[in-house]
């Protein structure tokens, strides 16, 4: 074991990727640092853990997850597949390109269960504060053990922050919303469309969450869905029952007034207004301050905190790629901590960051964003031994996905893609997505006899 201690905060996909990167090194017979990982939930998986709870959890901590019932992947699984652990290896059979949350969570766990990673994780443990001790070149981290109700501290040579950035809601105020008589919630607290059956729903925001929650509510029987946008509409071909309107100006009782002068009564308002990058355990001089960008400012290679080279952030970007991008970041971070990748001086790092930040500003369309993140991942892979894969083909799938959604927002999840890792083409799910109301793993993997007439695709337009 190397004479280094590495602390990892968070055991979601990013934290698990970091553990997997070190495990990969250890399997080659090479020494690795002493590693400790801390997770405030009682299980790994981060955002992929579903809980019925909202607000606070069992121990009074803010709920981390934003997952809801009936959530299915909104992008092809072939675009997020691990290069060292494929869907075929895990499920032993082809599955559809858009599986539900429970299926993806099972896949994430499958890879990490092959290792002893759980031995490195202390669950129900919250990071409360971090200090950097300049004289020792170490971080002092104060933790709370939620089960024992005890506080303790640890010291690390490197600190990896993998806490994600989709758990602290951005909650704007709209005049009159405090007197709205119906349900008002942020998407973070949305737990299922079945509570909005036969309701008129207003979604404020034009994010992926607005898009998906809107379609989910339509699918499960909401009377109407309105999506209110600030700058640009989503622009999909919406079915009857879903419409887009410009931003809400104010509320009067249960009536929302819009910038175009129109108004309508609603039963519920769901704020799909994004999330904040929040790190309450980090002091100001160690805190990443960024919005949801494809390339966060002040992170060298999107990973190393430029003001303190021993502080590492994983998964802090806006994301097209997810699991496999976290892997490439973790492999880069590992090799840097092991001394294989030397950082240039701060002036050169500043220029490198500025180059990427400026490049993002010139990327406007969804396809350009995909190309941007593809090039970013290519650069990271070239610097490590992470198993390479055909990123250009994955990028083409992403672009096809963008077109699929624009063409048919309700049925794009019925399309199938071919894995670049295995060459296996996905199978169509036994039930068209708009007809499938059961998102359980058991139902998904079962061979179900279907009534073809009953499942024939309806014209929702």
From Swiss-Prot:
It comes from the Bacteria. Induction: Expression is induced by TMA and HHP stress. It catalyses: trimethylamine + NADPH + O2 = trimethylamine N-oxide + NADP(+) + H2O. This is Trimethylamine monooxygenase. Its EC number is 1.14.13.148. SUPFAM superfamilies: FAD/NAD(P)-binding domain (SSF51905). Pfam families: FMO-like (PF00743). It is an enzyme of class 1 (oxidoreductase). InterPro entries: FAD/NAD-bd_sf, Flavin_mOase, Flavin_mOase-like, FMO-like. Catalyzes the oxidation of trimethylamine (TMA) to produce trimethylamine N-oxide (TMAO). The produced TMAO is accumulated in the cell, functioning as a piezolyte, improving both growth and survival at high hydrostatic pressure (HHP). FAD binds at residues 14, 39-41, 47-48, 64, 74, 127, 319, 322. Belongs to the FMO family. Its cofactor is FAD. Keywords: FAD, Flavoprotein, Monooxygenase, NADP, Oxidoreductase. It comes from Myroides profundi. One of its GO terms (molecular function) is NADP binding. NADP(+) binds at residues 72, 74, 206-207, 209, 230-231, 413. Optimum temperature is 25 degrees Celsius. Retains 20 to 40% of the maximum activity at 0 to 5 degrees Celsius.
């Amino acid at each position: 074991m190397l004479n280094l201690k590495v602390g990892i905060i968070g055991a979601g996909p990013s934290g698990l990727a970091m553990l997997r990167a070190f495990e990969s090194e250890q399997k080659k017979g090479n020494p690795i640092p002493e590693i400790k990982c801390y997770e405030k939930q009682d299980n790994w998986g981060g955002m992929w853990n579903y809980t019925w709870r909202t607000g606070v959890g069992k121990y009074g901590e803010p709920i981390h997850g934003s997952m809801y019932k009936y959530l299915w992947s909104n992008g092809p699984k072939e675009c997020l597949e691990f290069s060292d652990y494929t869907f075929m290896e895990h499920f032993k059979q082809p599955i559809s390109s858009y599986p539900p949350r429970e299926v993806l969570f099972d896949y994430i766990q499958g890879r990490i269960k092959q290792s002893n990673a759980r031995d490195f994780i202390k669950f129900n443990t919250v990071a409360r504060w971090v200090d950097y001790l300049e004289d020792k070149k170490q971080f002092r981290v104060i933790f709370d053990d939620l089960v024992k109700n005890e506080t303790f501290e640890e010291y690390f040579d490197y600190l990896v922050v993998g806490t994600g950035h989709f758990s602290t809601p951005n909650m704007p105020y709209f005049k009159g919303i405090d007197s709205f008589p119906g349900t008002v919630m942020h998407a973070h607290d949305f737990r299922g469309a079945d509570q909005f059956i036969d309701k008129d729903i207003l979604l404020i925001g034009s994010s992926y969450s607005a898009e998906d929650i809107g379609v989910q509510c339509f699918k499960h029987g909401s009377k109407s869905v309105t999506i209110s946008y600030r700058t640009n509409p989503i622009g999909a071909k919406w079915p009857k029952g879903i419409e887009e309107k410009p931003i809400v100006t104010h509320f009067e009782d249960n009536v929302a007034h819009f910038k175009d002068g129109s108004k309508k009564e609603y039963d519920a308002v769901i704020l799909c207004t994004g999330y904040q990058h929040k790190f309450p355990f980090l002091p100001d001089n160690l805190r990443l301050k960024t919005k949801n960008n494809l390339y966060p400012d002040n992170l060298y290679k999107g990973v190393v905190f430029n003001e303190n080279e021993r502080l590492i952030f994983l998964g802090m970007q806006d994301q097209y790629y997810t699991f496999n991008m976290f892997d490439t970041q973790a492999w880069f971070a590992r090799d840097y901590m092991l001394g294989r990748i030397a950082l240039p001086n701060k002036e050169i790092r500043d220029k490198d960051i500025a180059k990427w930040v400026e490049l993002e500003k010139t990327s406007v369309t969804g396809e350009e964003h995909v190309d941007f993140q593809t090039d970013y991942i290519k650069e990271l892979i070239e610097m490590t031994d992470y198993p390479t894969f055909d990123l250009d083909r994955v990028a083409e799938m992403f672009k096809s996905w963008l077109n699929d959604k624009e063409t048919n927002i309700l049925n794009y999840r019925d399309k199938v893609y071919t894995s670049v890792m295995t060459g296996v083409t996905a199978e169509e799910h036994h039930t068209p997505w708009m007809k499938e109301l059961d998102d359980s793993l058991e139902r998904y993997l079962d061979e179900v006899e279907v009534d073809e007439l009953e499942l024939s695709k309806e014209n929702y337009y």
